[in-house]
Amino acid sequence: MSIIEEARRGIITDEIKSISKLEKVSPEKVRKRIAEGKIMLLRNVKRPSKKLVPIGKGLTTKININIGTSSEVIDLDMELEKVKISNKWGDTLMDLSTGGDIDEIRRKIIDKSDLPVGTVPVYQAFIQSFKKKSGGAYFSEDELLSIVERQLKDGVAFMTIHAGLTRELAIRALKSDRVIPIVSRGGDMIAGWMIHNGKENPYRTNWKYLLELFKEYDATISLGDALRPGATADAHDEFQIGELIETARLVKDAINNGVQVMVEGPGHVPLNEVAWDVKLMKKLTGGVPYYVLGPLVIDVGAPYDHIASSIGAAIASAAGADLLCYLTPAEHLSLPNAKQVEEGAIAYRIAAHAGDIVKLGKKVRKWDDEVSYYRGKLEWDKMIEKLIDPEQAYKVYTQFGEPNVKACTMCGGYCPMMWAMEQVKKIG
């Protein structure tokens, strides 16, 4: 029985109790929202992750970290270093490897990860076809489905499944005047398969079987946005919205069948459209968890897209987005190295918290209030240990040596908080 089915029967499981304690939400609210598909627990019952990661309505915003090899850079040691960084900063992890022994890499990443691991199975199908048959679109439907099942057996907790993309939508998008017709790698692979084979999306024609597979492992289907905007000029055009409408139908079918599901979102979105992007998705899908890539609010930010996108991510989180997929300084330019992965992860941890202050209020802001209290008292050790990155904060605090006065080296003896405390003493 899946977690959704248990919740519908009114069962408060140990996992629901753990979610309640972690997120400070009543067990009954958690149960009800799981039953409705508004909260999910990323997991694979055959291989549980070490970290409990509930995502959805009324819960803190989570962040996802993408790692993985490319056809140009295959360095397993570097990817495993990224796993360590992900364990420290992230909530979920996706292995997007496209180079090397994909099965071996995935299994090693899952073994080293404390987090639920996700994948995009069409990558492996396309790459295997390319290597064996000299063309990426030559894989059969059975080969794609067998890869999905193999990855579930390995312990994958969630997968991007581009089932909302129809053949007709793909053809129209490719013929359109979009700045960039398709930027989703997995989406483009599915589009290419449909055009080459003259068939409908294999995820759509095998949807019922996919539901059975995911239900067996109680894993999550992450409905990919193949036609997400890859330029702010393309945001919320007929193709993005058309796919979202198709996706919304699949969402309802998955939940009705007791399968956990979330929806992936853009992408590149102008600042003024970010909040209503979230609200539109929630309205169409009945409030299932929303997993957004950024979004980037400008197109010219590289190599600072982790900053440009964290602006959109904070707004999305505040508006109700549930899972933020990070970007790194290497986005649009290169495979990220380990340092860039950490920089992206920290930017998104900040964005998620900024959004949660709006979305969840005082219970989240308590952390900020504690830091501000210690800052006002110039209790540096206590303040620093509460910060988002205490180790780096201490390095910055002491970069010119230990301050000679109680204040930091910015204001020194002219620190307003130090003087305010003196004035308070005089006032009595």
Swiss-Prot record:
Residues the entry annotates as binding [4Fe-4S] cluster: C408, C411, C415
Cofactor: [4Fe-4S] cluster
GO biological process, one term: thiamine biosynthetic process
Catalytic reactions on record: 5-amino-1-(5-phospho-beta-D-ribosyl)imidazole + S-adenosyl-L-methionine = 4-amino-2-methyl-5-(phosphooxymethyl)pyrimidine + CO + 5'-deoxyadenosine + formate + L-methionine + 3 H(+)
Pathway note: Cofactor biosynthesis; thiamine diphosphate biosynthesis
Keywords: 4Fe-4S, Iron, Iron-sulfur, Lyase, Metal-binding, S-adenosyl-L-methionine, Thiamine biosynthesis, Zinc
EC identifiers of the protein: 4.1.99.17
Annotated Zn(2+) binding sites: H268, H332
UniProt KW S-adenosyl-L-methionine keyword: yes
Record-linked Pfam families: ThiC_Rad_SAM
Co-factor: note: Binds 1 [4Fe-4S] cluster per subunit. The cluster is coordinated with 3 cysteines and an exchangeable S-adenosyl-L-methionine.
Function: Catalyzes the synthesis of the hydroxymethylpyrimidine phosphate (HMP-P) moiety of thiamine from aminoimidazole ribotide (AIR) in a radical S-adenosyl-L-methionine (SAM)-dependent reaction.
PANTHER family documented for this protein: PHOSPHOMETHYLPYRIMIDINE SYNTHASE, CHLOROPLASTIC, THIAMINE BIOSYNTHESIS PROTEIN THIC
Protein name: Phosphomethylpyrimidine synthase
Organism field: Sulfolobus acidocaldarius (strain ATCC 33909 / DSM 639 / JCM 8929 / NBRC 15157 / NCIMB 11770)
